[in-house]
Amino acid sequence: MRTLFNLLWLALACSPVHATLSKSDAKKAASKTLLEKSQFSDKPVQERGLVVTDLKAESVVLEHRSYCSAKARDRHFAGDVLGYVTPWNSHGYDVTKVFGSKFTQISPVWLQLKRRGREMFEVTGLHDVDQGWMRAVRKHAKGLHIVPRLLFEDWTYDDFRNVLDSEDEIEELSKTVVQVAKNQHFDGFVVEVWNQLLSQKRVGLIHMLTHLAEALHQARLLALLVIPPAITPGTDQLGMFTHKEFEQLAPVLDGFSLMTYDYSTAHQPGPNAPLSWVRACVQVLDPKSKWRSKILLGLNFYGMDYATSKDAREPVVGARYIQTLKDHRPRMVWDSQASEHFFEYKKSRSGRHVVFYPTLKSLQVRLELARELGVGVSIWELGQGLDYFYDLL
């Protein structure tokens, strides 16, 4: 994989298409503002010839707002679709109102679970809960479940040790979580805890999650778990959550939000989620396809901008991506091995940049993979994507 990217960088560096513009050419280019459609389309992107590998920056800028409003509630993907929304990218709240029927679960990133003392727990972040938005989303998307992410925050190793070794602690934790769900009219939670404990005390963590799931189920609530990739990015090594843990938790949890993104690093720039790695992460977790429908394949709706001279990277969301396309009008390149588009541009101060950001084609390929593997998808996160992405779901 790394050899491929070294060749890729060499090809980019030697490419003649990025020659410096003359002053007159630069003025001509600057005088032409790329157009953006503001109206809806009567056809989805699949019928407009937009899901292609030979993509043009001008096409992305022109079409990205133009989704098919007539089919905004129609589903094209049969598996479960979980979408995350965050307070810091508020466009995601609007997305769920328009496209809510395309999702089975929406997970607002609102809440943190903290341990305050012996058998004392508190769920914080409740000030972010928007009951009006929840009512509006449910009104337009019947059967949609709102399952906020619940992050175990500020837990020390001693906190974990004391809780995981005590049935009373686990019981109080479960009671606290269930009561918050009832009070706030949630349909359950997406629990994020596995990364916090690393590889320590996995047996105790599985026991706690099993108990928590049972308590939620007794209250007719859902229990999902965020899990890291089964294969560590850039290696052939197993990750922190493998087939062994999956086999124990799959019978008791309702779903697993699999983080199949963030593959590349600032020191090794490249795609966000190479397709072969994504496939392998699912196959390692469940080689016999026993619980595949509970796996939610992670799709990133954000990208990465790599400054090659600084070994640095920054996340790219939709608005910045579109602005970069407007400013630089780059040549879009399809990486056939990773099944992702990328482009290069230059800044006077920071030098050469390379951007990997999802496109209609890269997303379609991953949705097809999800269908083939028999899994659902989870999207991080709805406020970061482009509006016409949702025609694919």
UniProtKB/Swiss-Prot annotation:
Database matches in SUPFAM superfamilies: (Trans)glycosidases
Compartments, record wording: Secreted; Lysosome
GO cellular component, one term: lysosome
Superkingdom of this protein's organism: Eukaryota
Keywords: Immunity, Innate immunity, Lysosome, Secreted, Signal
InterPro entries the UniProt entry points to: Chitinase_II/V-like_cat, Chitinase_insertion_sf, Glyco_hydro18_cat, Glycoside_hydrolase_SF
One GO biological process term: innate immune response
Stored Gene3D superfamilies: 3,6-anhydro-alpha-l-galactosidase (1.10.8.360), 3.10.50.10, Glycosidases (3.20.20.80)
Secretion signal, residue range per the UniProt entry: 1-19
Domain named GH18: residues: 79-393
Keyword check for Signal: yes
GO molecular function: chitin binding; oligosaccharide binding
A UniProt-annotated Pfam family: Glyco_hydro_18
PANTHER family, per database record: CHITINASE DOMAIN-CONTAINING PROTEIN 1, CHITINASE DOMAIN-CONTAINING PROTEIN 1 FAMILY MEMBER
Annotated function: Saccharide- and LPS-binding protein with possible roles in pathogen sensing and endotoxin neutralization. Ligand-binding specificity relates to the length of the oligosaccharides, with preference for chitotetraose (in vitro).
Family membership noted in the UniProt record: Belongs to the glycosyl hydrolase 18 family.
Complexes and interactors: Interacts with STAB1.
Name the record gives this protein: Chitinase domain-containing protein 1
Native species: Pongo abelii (Sumatran orangutan)
